Amino acid sequence: MHELASNVQEQAGSFKDADALNIAFRFWRPAGEARATVVIVPGFNAHSGYYSWVAEQLVAERLAVYAIDLRGRGKSEGERFYVDDFADYVSDIAPLVDLVKSRETGLPVFLLGHSAGGVAACLYALDHQQTLRGLICESFAYELPAPGFALSAIKGLSHVAPHAHVLHLKNEDFSRDPKVVQAMNADPLIAQESQPAETLAALIRADELLKQSFARFTLPILILHGTADKAAKASGSQHFYETAGSADKTLKLYEGGFHDLLNDTGKSEVMGDITRWIDAHLTT
């Protein structure tokens, strides 16, 4: 999952965010001139290192790739896995996009967000639609597989014990590839990952905000979801597609696909759909 072709070099960088936290990212560039850039925002049980194979495929298409570790995740500073407002994640994404635009002068920027990272990416995109050529939302964590009373209980708990870790997602639910699951189980950056009550409450609040904002989207959107996703309901992506204001929007559902489509057994099909969509939006 983390292996790269010999001609694709993974590099690391960092910057200080608005709260003076050191935010880590990885990047990959083609040897020659890039046609565009893709900024990746990972979700829960993940970090920028999980996108090496994705980067290899995109670099082969002459695309520069930058993947962030949001605060408290991967190699970034901050309380582990904690955030009290997804606006803080947006404030991590914004300077990375600015950095990318300054480094990759004049190139179109596509934003790809996975799961809760897709929620953060959507929030960023809402207020930066002129900055982006397109938004790719994979396994959107908009509708969670929990009853309403459980979500209300989490919001209530967040007021009493915001830092209590209350949700541990099963790595087995992310991919049908046993090698991917084995690597996740052995990864010290996520091996003990569980989500604090406040992080989950912040996700719920962000989803509620987006529900009122989908009609504001005008930029091109590609929405991807697996039908067997146990961590986020595919119906949430369906709702996003149906209510987004964008005239240019596409929904792709993958039969039997698990939560991390780009590390699942059908990843080549998903990657092909992404690269073809990007190509189409570089020629229009």
What does each model-identified segment do?
Residues 104-115:
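Alpha/beta-hydrolase fold nucleophile elbow
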Residues 45-48, 74-104, 270:
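Catalytic nucleophile-loop/oxyanion-hole region of alpha/beta-hydrolase
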Residues 1-32:
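N-terminal cap/lid segment of alpha/beta-hydrolase-fold proteins
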Residues 255-284:
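Catalytic active-site module of serine/aspartate enzymes centered on a nucleophile-bearing elbow/loop
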Residues 50, 55-78:
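Conserved alpha/beta-hydrolase
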Residues 230-236:
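Conserved alpha/beta-hydrolase "acid-adjacent" motif
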Residues 114-195:
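Alpha/beta-hydrolase-fold enzymes
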Residues 217, 223-225, 229:
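Short beta-strand/loop motif that positions the catalytic acidic residue
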